Regions:
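N-terminal export signals
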Residues: 1-23
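C-terminal helical cap(s) of enzyme catalytic domains, especially alpha/beta-barrels
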Residues: 286-303
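Acidic-and-aromatic substrate-binding clefts and catalytic sites of carbohydrate-active enzymes
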Residues: 41-48, 64-76, 147-151, 182-187, ...
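Boundary/entry segment of secreted carbohydrate-active catalytic domains
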Residues: 26-46
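Acidic (Asp/Glu)-rich catalytic clusters
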Residues: 29-32, 51-57, 71-96, 127-136, ...
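Active-site acidic/histidine proton-transfer and metal-coordination neighborhood
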Residues: 8, 45-48, 102-202, 287
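Acidic/histidine-rich catalytic cores of soluble enzymes
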Residues: 61-62, 91, 160-256
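Hydrophobic faces of well-ordered beta-strands that scaffold small-molecule active sites
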Residues: 35-41, 62-64, 88-93, 140-142, ...
Length: 303
């Protein structure tokens, strides 16, 4: 259902009250600078061209998805970040192996939940952590998958153990480990964070994913996830209309995310990180939508 409810002031006054346990303590980039915009990009094999596009949009931070994690890419990426003045806020990790983004195959293919790909993905996240360390990227971020709602499910316990292994590895590299929201309900995500029990865990709060997967209204989810939020994906979407497929992503301001109240809530939480625009289409329309989102979000952040 759409984002409705009590007035913004009374709703946000309760943010963060209901979460027990400690929020992440390991320092990252967040907290040093004012609320600012970012863009998630796929770097590909040409870091200079990819980061040049971010700079041409007059955006100063980026979450980076890398196809290549070889050491030979460290130098070119660092040079491109410095040349274009882009602050990297997270390295986004997916795979290896097939990932299917729907309700039937998703639980079998996404993240650290599936047994068949778990070992390879643990190793891949560790490689990504090493790569991020050499590039000066403060966080590693991934979808952990359809974490079971039932904490007595053996898959839940196995997934927690796997997350603990990669989060501990990131901690040794001086990084935060971030869960990308989407496949799990907010209370399941908080349970997993607390059961993993390491202080460098955080959440990349993807506003649309909570809606696309039918898991929560993001405004309500902030009450649980607020203390853990280290990154934001500014994205919009519609609720699912059939039980097989995710809801539809739409341009920011055209979906069910209540951005004015979300930004107000982030300010109340004293969130000091990046609000990272994500638009999962390609071509000229993607650039148009990113520019429109930037204008819209700048107006909200500045008020």
């Amino acid at each position: 259902m759409p984002a409705t409810g009590a007035a913004a002031g009374s709703h946000h006054a309760s943010l963060g009250r209901h979460v027990s346990g400690r929020a992440p303590t390991l320092s990252a980039n967040e907290g040093r600078r004012p609320l600012r915009l970012g863009l998630i990009i796929s770097v590909g094999r040409d870091p200079d061209a990819a980061l040049g596009k971010v700079r041409n949009l007059d955006i100063g931070t980026a979450q980076l998805f890398m196809d290549e994690l070889e050491s030979s890419f460290v130098g070119p990426l660092r040079l491109a970040l410095e040349k274009h003045g882009i602050e990297p806020t997270a390295l986004v990790v997916g795979g290896p192996g097939k990932e299917v983004w729907n309700f039937y195959q998703g639980p079998l293919t996404i993240g650290l939940v599936p047994r068949t790909t778990r070992s390879a993905r643990i190793a891949h996240i560790k490689r990504a952590s090493d790569f991020a360390k050499h590039c000066g990227i403060p966080a590693v971020q991934t979808h952990c998958g359809f974490i079971p709602e039932n904490p007595n499910n053996p898959l839940y316990k196995e997934t927690v153990q796997a997350i603990r292994e990669v989060a501990a590895y990131c901690r040794r590299n001086g990084q935060n480990f971030r869960y990308e929201t989407g496949q799990e309900t907010p209370i399941t995500l908080v349970r997993a964070i607390q059961d993993v029990g390491i202080d460098n865990q955080g959440v990349n709060f993807d506003l649309a994913n909570l809606i696309l997967y039918g898991k929560a209204n993001p405004l309500d989810a902030m009450e649980l996830l607020g203390p853990y939020i280290q990154g934001i994906h500014a994205k919009d979407g519609l609720w699912p209309t059939n039980p097989r497929d995710l809801g539809q992503e739409v341009p920011i301001g055209k979906g069910k995310v209540d951005f004015p109240r979300i930004i107000a809530g982030l300010k109340e939480l004293n969130y000091r990180g990046a609000v990272t625009i994500e638009r999962e289409i390609s071509g000229p329309q993607q650039i148009e939508d990113i520019r429109a989102a930037k204008t819209y979000l700048e107006r909200l952040i500045g008020t």
